[in-house]
């Protein structure tokens, strides 16, 4: 005979209800915690802007540095446009080429206004380990503490750096394509900026990171074409800027590791590409792909005032250089997209470098391009030569894409370069 269970007493019923409510609350708490944890996991630090550090060159080089040899008790304010936005920011200052410690007295950041101004409500003090300043060892970077500042995609930040001591400007980026201001005293928290002088180079500031939901990073590497030498100053019209706009909806950051004067095989206006890939490229968190556009200066500098004593490389020399870059990418499990070299007939004519172009140099460029197209050495290619050349005169840039010096694309040429990149091919999707 099976006995029916005895009915619960009122006290037992109350206890059971309390237990069920507790279980439900615990389950809800665990579920909410899981959601919160999942949300937190979506947020990560990613580089949203960079400028590759360069060493100062000797005064006898053909190009001026455009910056003073040193500053003391001055603030430098620099504007950067980020690719991705976020709710927290870190700044990176570089003493890569300093031979003595760099004393940072103070730093500040905020959303940029006009002519060096900062939106007052967004001004933030930058700290390093909780301190206003820091002593940066030679060769080292200084990474700031995270700071709360909501930054939108494609937003502009004004970064202010106060240098209280006599400070040689040993680490810089020559072709910033953005006005920077010098002012006396500590102006890191000032809304407006009382400038004593300006430049379009960058000093010490090498990277901005944001904490945000992101799907990784694309880095473009190259010379002055990538650095934006033909782009309008203060307009953010480098080809990487247009590419960043295309990738922003996918939450993918774009970093520009171009250096004007950069070369594949030699140093001068910065170290050669292979020597800086680990620092500028492979160290980036969430790296998805790299676009490489380099080699025209290797071909064209020899015999000019830039490299009078150097011999022009052979095709085998160039191929070996590319293969070393490819080998580094493979070792770091990074997708590498090779770009063909654009046409340059008539480049820099009427300047002290009017011998930059020569038919023999152009013949080598075309051989290099043939290898890039046909070797299958890269994971993919983008044919900038085909995009930018004049159909009626293939050795020259399309006039509408030419900045005017017949070497560097202008704003519309840069837009055409970015628009020609198949994003699926770029990312290997």
Residue spans for each PLM region:
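Oxyanion-hole/transition-state-stabilizing segment in secreted/luminal serine hydrolases
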Residues: 231, 259, 263-317
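Bacterial N-terminal signal peptides
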Residues: 23-34
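N-terminal secretory targeting modules
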Residues: 38-221, 228-234, 429
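Surface-exposed amphipathic alpha-helices with a cationic face
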Residues: 322-330
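Bacterial N-terminal signal peptides that target proteins for export
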Residues: 2-25
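Structural recognition of the beta-strand scaffold that forms the well-ordered cores
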Residues: 90, 217-222, 226, 253-258, ...
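Solvent-exposed loop/turn segments at secondary-structure junctions
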Residues: 97, 165-166, 224-228, 259-265, ...
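Catalytic His-Asp segment of secreted/periplasmic serine-dependent ester chemistry enzymes
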Residues: 274, 300-302, 342-429
